[in-house]
């Protein structure tokens, strides 16, 4: 055997040793997720164990279970053509320690879409090992604002808005003592950059909470942001004013009715139906007010649309409009009923008999309504004159 044969045997033996050693390795790296801010840079390292030469190996970085190649190193070259386009200009493989089996993937300008798991794969021939590292992209926004809807029949509606969070933050209402107030509704959406826009509402039905704070927290970094609003007690005074107005109107109606009827009693000695016309109209008015007020209360107290529904505000405005329309209808209907009632009452009054006939049986049980002569003068001197009139177009109605 010559020198060439000896050299060939040495090379083959060396390659065999390299192959055997290469088939006996594992890949290690970071065990905890890597927290990285939105728009920042991150480095992911992986290491062969035991440490060994890795220049002759194929090194790949994948996402989503090998479906998205992030970086490829093979035969000592970086192959950008086999990676997805969004990582071509934003990734770099640091190979300073590749002789010891360590490489580092650097990703620039992180986006919310970069959040997830990354597979680091070392491959020699058909043998390969991998390590999985997770990136947690975080974003916190200080842009917050509270919108207050105009007070309505349900109360005061507060809306807290904040955008630009990742991942989805924890959101809640708190009072001035730090106690949690249950939110009426919560909603979120994601923009084209996959950042979360948060919305939370709170319906305050009483003035017990004067200072309200909207509180958000990033659950990964525990960073907090908050904004507060102080509510004036005047926002809830409209309820007391409304109750006082209705109470005052009710007492005024009762007082007017009693005063008028007492006056009629003092003047005529009895509460005759012919004298207390205003009592009848007042009763009609009170009945109408009670009926319509009852309908309004039923509409207001009945829960038709949940507060969390997007049509809640429209439903509230509809109730307010209906309330105004009902009040206008009350006034119109009462005016119309009163006009028709007193007009008909005046048309059917007719004429009454002379005083000296009031004790006679005929005059005591009837009232003569004479349409043809109601605007003239009819003279009756005695009951015989009444009996001698014979048939006539008189309408006999009971006396009241």
UniProtKB/Swiss-Prot annotation:
Instruction: Indicate which residues are glycosylated according to the record.
Output: 197
Mark the transmembrane ranges.
241-261, 281-301, 322-342
Q: In which tissues is it expressed?
A: Expressed in skin, thymus and mammary gland.
- Residues forming the Ig-like V-type domain are 23-133
User: Could you tell me which InterPro entries the record lists for this protein?
Assistant: BTN3A2-like_Ig-C, Ig-like_dom, Ig-like_dom_sf, Ig-like_fold, Ig_sub, Ig_V-set, IgSF_BTN/MOG
- Classify the protein's membrane topology as the record does: Multi-pass membrane protein
| Cytoplasmic topological intervals | 262-280, 343-400
**PANTHER family per the record?**
BUTYROPHILIN, SELECTION AND UPKEEP OF INTRAEPITHELIAL T-CELLS PROTEIN 2-RELATED
- The protein's role, per its UniProt record: May act by engaging a cell surface molecule on immature T-cells in the embryonic thymus.
* Identification of the protein by name: Selection and upkeep of intraepithelial T-cells protein 2
Give the organism the record lists.
Mus musculus
